[in-house]
Amino acid sequence: MIFTLRPYQQEAVDATLNHFRRHKTPAVIVLPTGAGKSLVIAELARLARGRVLVLAHVKELVAQNHAKYQALGLEADIFAAGLKRKESHGKVVFGSVQSVARNLDAFQGEFSLLIVDECHRIGDDEESQYQQILTHLTKVNPHLRLLGLTATPFRLGKGWIYQFHYHGMVRGDEKALFRDCIYELPLRYMIKHGYLTPPERLDMPVVQYDFSRLQAQSNGLFSEADLNRELKKQQRITPHIISQIMEFAATRKGVMIFAATVEHAKEIVGLLPAEDAALITGDTPGAERDVLIENFKAQRFRYLVNVAVLTTGFDAPHVDLIAILRPTESVSLYQQIVGRGLRLAPGKTDCLILDYAGNPHDLYAPEVGTPKGKSDNVPVQVFCPACGFANTFWGKTTADGTLIEHFGRRCQGWFEDDDGHREQCDFRFRFKNCPQCNAENDIAARRCRECDTVLVDPDDMLKAALRLKDALVLRCSGMSLQHGHDEKGEWLKITYYDEDGADVSERFRLQTPAQRTAFEQLFIRPHTRTPGIPLRWITAADILAQQALLRHPDFVVARMKGQYWQVREKVFDYEGRFRLAHELRG
């Protein structure tokens, strides 16, 4: 059988060849689920001059990648205990990570290219099996090239797996294993051009879980204990949900149900017809799992329930209904789940997506790379005033799309000098100034990036202020603006309110150029909801008219000066141990 690469697959191959002709640095290709990564891998392995090792984390992917290479009329070795083959001397070897890592002695020969499928699984731990393999192969050949392929280059708890994107944006930091993303294809392109089945999403407002009270852990993920606790409170809902899924499934061939926890999954499968449903969890023995997957693909039963174990490396094209009964913490994970139902199959016209968890993700939205925050936040485009780069941040818009707030910190654009050295644009949308040198630092920085001065921790500052008899600390719940004139000219008064009713104010004069510049620096810049986008004003009345574009601080610290309180510190973007206004803490 001869395969003709689709245009985007050829572009991915060309991008790889061009990159490795000019660079030795590790690179990654981002292709959505169903884009045919196996064919791209096969073509690259065919074109490579030296030996190639292709790694995958499950035997199904090893077999799939090997089959596509064989379909080109070429022979290759397989090194995977799960496939009962351990060959390692051919020009091209397809191996499972576990088997190769345990048998590095069998890989003493030199490889010129290492390809890692589902490369987002590579951990930072030097003792991980991926890192052991990479270290070993690099010792044998210091000029080894590394290429990764994935549909999800951003992982919660880990961040971006690469540093620079070929569209000119910075993603990860210098610790990222892959330096460059050299090619990326959006999901929308695949669906628009008929390479994937169109999804038909139905939000299920009548019966759905409410996970809004859940708080993600520091790694961005929800804990299983918290999920089980919420599900127990809402256990009466599950039978109604399953009943509705079965109604929708009556005309469907394959149904995948994504549960929140193992306990939840067992409850779900108990509500489905026993002869027509199966459950796969991380604890399912390998042999049993293989049989279940084979029977599901052969359509011997309709419902397959799982807990986040079939989000990658699983190919069942007949699936035409995806039911999501778990909160998904990122756009990437949501796209992975939905992607299980988007492969083309005979007679399949769409894939029904039933979301019973109120997930706020847009299937076509770009991955922003930071936690979404509030559910009404959306990806917004913000141009850097310094370099002009079009950043994508979380933000808020009006109904007509007008930007009213964004949460970007630093421009994501990068430059390359004549020597090929890359540097990120230094413009910061939100920052805190160093008290010693006035350099702008990230709002979470502990030390100044210019002079290394230790920056004041907001918690320490608030704690110290609370001890002082002549200090007032406001847990700020709002602010109001008032303007007027006197013999010295125009002024603007800002009053900050504590949730308990106390208030403190500050006043700015706006008559001279120096006064107006000070007002811009001391008030407009820290208070604007849209940093980087100038607030147009001539008079104080213009400021009042745009008050909706200004934010109040989280805390205000004032000191007594004579008979009046004088504002000394304002704390924004606070994340610490003190409660915010109107915030409930257990």
UniProtKB/Swiss-Prot annotation:
Q: What does the UniProt entry report for the null mutant? A: 100- to 10000-fold decrease in survival after IR. Double radA-radD deletions have nearly 10(6)-fold lower survival upon IR, and the double mutant is more severely affected by UV radiation than either of the single mutants alone (up to 100 J/m(2)). The single mutation is more sensitive to dsDNA breaks induced by CFX, the double radA-radD mutant is inviable upon CFX treatment; the SOS response is slightly induced in the single and more induced in the double mutant. No effect on RecA-mediated conjugational DNA recombination.
Q: Which PROSITE patterns match?
A: HELICASE_ATP_BIND_1, HELICASE_CTER
Query: What's the record's pH-dependence note?
Result: Optimum pH is >7.5.
**Which residues constitute the signal peptide according to the record?**
none
Q: Does the keyword DNA-binding apply?
A: yes
This entry's Enzyme Commission designation comes to 3.6.4.12
**Which GO terms fall under molecular function for this chain's record?**
ATP binding; ATP hydrolysis activity; DNA binding; helicase activity; single-stranded DNA binding; zinc ion binding
Q: Which domain of life is it from?
A: Bacteria
Look up the record and name the cofactor or cofactors this protein needs: Zn(2+)
Question: Catalysed reaction(s)?
Answer: ATP + H2O = ADP + phosphate + H(+)
| The protein's enzyme class | hydrolase
Region ranges (Zinc finger domain): 376-425
Q: Where is the Helicase C-terminal domain?
A: 241-386
Alphabetized InterPro entries for the sequence = Helicase/UvrB_N (IPR006935), Helicase_ATP-bd (IPR014001), Helicase_C-like (IPR001650), Helicase_Restrict-Modif_Enz (IPR050742), P-loop_NTPase (IPR027417), Ribosomal_zn-bd (IPR011332)
Q: Which Pfam families match?
A: Helicase_C (PF00271), ResIII (PF04851)
Q: What is said about the domains?
A: The C-terminal domain (residues 356-586) is required to alleviate the deleterious effects of UV or ciprofloxacin (CFX) treatment in a double radA-radD mutant; its effect on ionising irradiation (IR) survival in the single radD mutant were not reported. Crystals have 4 domains; helicase ATP-binding (residues 7-185), helicase C-terminal (residues 187-365), a zinc finger domain (residues 376-425) and the C-terminal domain (429-574).
Quaternary structure, per UniProt, is: Monomer. Interacts with single-stranded DNA-binding protein SSB.
Q: Briefly state the protein's biological role.
A: RadD contains helicase motifs, suggesting it may be a helicase, although that activity has not been observed. In combination with RadA is important in repair of double-strand DNA breaks (DSB). Has DNA-independent ATPase activity that is stimulated by single-stranded DNA-binding protein SSB. ATPase is stimulated by a peptide with the last 10 residues of SSB, but not when the peptide's last Phe residue is missing. Binds ssDNA; binding is slightly better in the presence of nucleotides.
Recorded protein name is Putative DNA repair helicase RadD
- What species is this protein from? Escherichia coli (strain K12)
User: What's the encoding gene here?
Assistant: radD
